[in-house]
A protein has these predicted regions:
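Core catalytic lobe of class I
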Residues: 1-309, 313-318
Length: 320
């Protein structure tokens, strides 16, 4: 499937009239830093102004950004608000209860190496990426990272003639019709995760670990997909100022960060929106993965639009 896209030179809210419902919205707005961002070249105008009269002015603007973007989500859609922890906390507290109730999680991304010059507080080296869904039923694909030796040693502690294995739940978390039955002398309080024919099949293949307290499904080390990725991301490195990590935009995010968000939260035929396109990382990640059928990225800076257009025509560069 070829991903189609639009690069729109306009204000962030121009998507309101496009009639689309998006499966994924990624918000990476100004962070209320009270700074003006440009590239190192003093002649460059690629960047943005992040100066505000007050925090109240900024929060009023950001609340409008979030609620307007949230309204564009499809029923199974999710929105990621990338900011610092303070601002995302303020934002969550100001959102309507109907939206707050669909808060999914907060991802902490380790965006910086440890600081050696801290004096009066803990080093601030993580960004906050808040995930909120449109409804309780939203699209999500579990992603896996590489297994490290320590995790493998601590998790796959059981062993049989096939090999080392870990224990995964086979009993239910809540009662469901058709899953409440007795098997092998066991009738779990909340039933099973599988129907009886599946439980019988698993047991016939010796894939059930019958423990003293309750049964578990065996997950063998050699069959493991990896370690499920949680909400602390320390394996995606920030873009440095070296030649192999060329920075095209002051607050440019690594493409691997958007790869992960898109792969986990957008179906293959979905639509992605980035109202603050900047360097075009969301666009490039979408084109690289070919997951969404359509992606729209917006920016009000003509040089950012030019940059995104050039990069989208050239493809993914090595410094990403």
């Amino acid at each position: 499937m070829n991903t189609t896209f639009d690069i729109v030179h306009s204000e962030w809210d121009s998507f309101k009239t496009d009639g689309n419902k998006y499966n994924l919205v990624y918000l990476d707005p100004p962070f209320y830093t009270q700074k003006t961002y440009t590239m190192d070249d003093k002649k460059s105008v690629i960047g943005f102004d992040d100066n505000w009269n007050s925090i109240d002015e900024y929060m009023k603007w950001l609340l409008n950004v979030f609620e307007t973007s949230f309204a564009s989500l499809s029923p199974d859609g999710v929105i990621y608000s990338h900011n610092n922890f303070k601002i995302n906390s303020f934002l969550l507290s100001r959102l309507p209860e109907s939206i707050r109730n669909n808060f999914v999680t907060n991802i902490s991304w380790l965006r910086s190496h440890p600081h050696n010059n801290i004096k009066n507080s803990w080093g601030n080296i993580v960004d906050s990426i808040m995930m909120i869904s449109k409804t309780k039923k939203f699209y999500f694909k579990v992603l896996y990272g590489k297994l490290d030796n320590k995790y493998s040693k601590n998790s796959f502690t059981n062993k049989d003639e096939v090999g080392n294995y870990s224990l995964t739940p086979i009993t239910g978390e809540k009662s469901r019709m058709g899953y409440d039955f007795e098997y092998n002398g066991v009738r779990p309080k909340f039933g099973w995760r599988y129907k009886k024919d599946k439980v019988v099949e698993l047991n016939g293949k010796n894939l059930i670990h019958w423990g003293k307290n309750k049964p578990y499904k065996k997950l063998y080390l050699h069959e493991s997909k990896g370690r499920p990725i949680q909400n602390f991301w320390n394996d995606i490195h920030p873009i440095t100022r070296t030649e192999l990590n060329k920075r095209n935009y002051p607050t440019q995010k690594p493409i691997k960060l958007l790869d992960r968000i898109i792969e986990s939260s957008c179906p293959v035929d979905g639509k992605v929106l980035d109202p603050f396109g900047g360097s075009g990382t969301t666009l490039l990640a979408s084109l690289e993965n070919q997951i969404p059928s359509y992606v729209k990225t917006i920016d009000n800076n003509s040089d950012a639009i030019k940059l995104m257009t050039e990069l989208s025509s050239k493809g993914i560069q090595k410094y990403f």
